[in-house]
Amino acid sequence: MPTPFRDLHNKSNASASSYETAWSSSFSSRRSTNNDSKSNLKEIKDEPISNLDESISILENNISMMSVSSPTPAYRTPARVIAREAPMTPGDRLLQKIEKEDERDMLRQLYPEMFDSNQKPRQKPKEVKKALKVESLSDYENDDKENVPPCGKPSKEKEEKKQRTKKIVISSDSEDDGNFENYLKTLREKPTEPAKPERKIPVKKDFVVDDDYISEESSEEESEEEEEDVDDEEYRESSPEVEAKISYSDRKQKKRPTDEEEWFLLSLSEKFSGPIHEDAKVYIKETSLRYKKHRESLLTRLQDILVRRIFSAIPSEKLKVIWNARLRKSAGQCRNHSNGNSTVEMSPVVCTTAERVRDTLIHELCHAATWVVDRLHKEGHGPGWKRWGARCSSVFKSLPFIERCHSYEIEAKFFYVCEKDGCDVEIKRQSKSLDTSRKACGRCFGRFILYRYCRRTNTRIRIEDPKAKPVGPILSNSSKPSPPAPRRIVSEHPEGFKEYSEEHYWKYTAQGLKHSDVMGKLLKEFKELKQL
């Protein structure tokens, strides 16, 4: 008898599915027997033996067909080699979506750069990988770290960090159109150089008035002065001396210098809290420099010290220092002459304290030294002036740094104040030079009231203006003036002669007569016609 089907199947490598398929196809005509069932079924032994042999042979054939043996590996077809053509341009890709031939021709005419095959394809922007920041251990991790033995590791496993999902950005059609238009613009534009960064010029607003520097040979133009001022400010900001220098206005000198002359110069400062020099006590009083003798003696003393200690290279016959009361806003000025001499002028209106006189004189002597010693023309506050200023700071180290401009508040003797309550217009003058009968407030067209400054009480006293005259109210600009009277034209000739002369003038000029003769004849004829 042949080997049972299940034993053959167990010895082979066939799967369960192949077993079921072969069994169902071979014994489809037979019914399975159930030992537990109580129904009366036909027994297999009643079937003829011939049918059983046929079914077994069919089963064996099915098993061989169902790959009872080990399966063979799958066959892979070789990759096809595609003949690649030339790369498509952006215009060719766009033409594939357009059906009408007219629209294709129009696209080729409007955007020829899209069909240029020599152009490099757009490259995707490089993705920049951002480094992950490693955060410090949390509190509980630090606690575990403390309890770990010296050579051991904590048993607690670290939690794995969840990676963030990437955001998916869906771009609309309008964004795609905008990107396409920007791409076309980049194709058409020519490569340009990157813009150079603009140079910011520092502007200082804490200076009120600039000092004057005048030369007899040629006056400096305003544009050149502005350029020198800007360069000077940049030099001062970048200078290491200025960075290391402590602002003199914020500090108070308490120690007395060992040098007697430096002690005298330092005693003239308003914020000096140390012992004051005996010779400087006269000049630091509030009203001392109002007297001419004190101003002259202080200026002579300062000139002697500074020229001997710093500006010894300037000959005494080439330098002259005087007071000039006509300087109302400038603290001082240096006039350079063509013969090599220099004159320093000081303003008694601005230099009302000994400290202002000292600082202004040093400033102007630096200008004089650049002309007399260095022979530098139009130097201004350039490197030559800065060298002399640095020399002053090195000799007298306790003195403040020499400033380029002063910010002194100028005292005024007279004040012209608008009489209206809501208006705050105020004009300062050193003399009663404003005619209140002719001048009015430019803001509200009100009258001016004259006040005088009293130095004793530090108040303003109203006085009468000697130039004031009783006049009518000032008309505002809004009121229109009355039109002028019509002008009467007086003519030498009688009425109607103009028309008569125009009509008969050419009759006499054809005869070759002069203009005066023609007009005489016409006037004579016109009078005869009037008498008739």
From Swiss-Prot:
Keyword tRNA processing recorded: no
Annotated stretches, region: Disordered: 1-50, 84-181, 213-253, 468-489
Record field: compositional bias (Low complexity): 14-32
Keywords: Chromosome
Disruption phenotype: Mutant worms become hypersensitive to formaldehyde-induced DNA damage. Mutant worms exhibit significant reduction in brood size at 25 degrees Celsius and also exhibit a high incidence of male progeny at both 20 and 25 degrees Celsius. Moreover, exhibit a mortal germline (MRT) phenotype characterized by transgenerational loss of fecundity and vitality, marked by reduced lifespan, decreased mobility, and loss of fertility in later generations. Mutants have a mortal germline, where brood sizes become progressively smaller and the population fails to survive beyond 12 generations.
Keyword Metal-binding among record annotations: no
Domain SprT-like: start-end pairs: 308-398
Location within or outside the cell: Chromosome
GO cellular component, one term: condensed chromosome
Comp. bias (Acidic residues): 213-235
GO terms, molecular function: SUMO polymer binding
Gene Ontology biological process: meiotic chromosome segregation; protein-DNA covalent cross-linking repair
UniProt cross-references to Pfam families, sorted A to Z: SprT-like
SMART domains: SprT
Tissues/organs with expression: Mainly expressed in germ cells and early embryonic, proliferating cells.
Top-level taxonomic group: Eukaryota
Biased composition (Basic and acidic residues): 1-10, 39-48, 94-107, 124-133, 236-251
Family label: Belongs to the serine-aspartate repeat-containing protein (SDr) family.
Role according to the record: May play a role in DNA-protein cross-links (DPCs) clearance through a SUMO-dependent recruitment to sites of DPCs, ensuring the genomic stability by protecting germ cells and early embryos from various sources of damage. May resolve the topoisomerase II (top-2) DPCs. Limits replication stress and DNA double-strand breaks.
PANTHER family xrefs: GERM CELL NUCLEAR ACIDIC PROTEIN, TRANSCRIPTIONAL REGULATOR
Subunit structure: Interacts with top-2; this interaction allows the resolution of topoisomerase II (top-2) DNA-protein cross-links.
Protein name: Germ cell nuclear acidic-1 protein
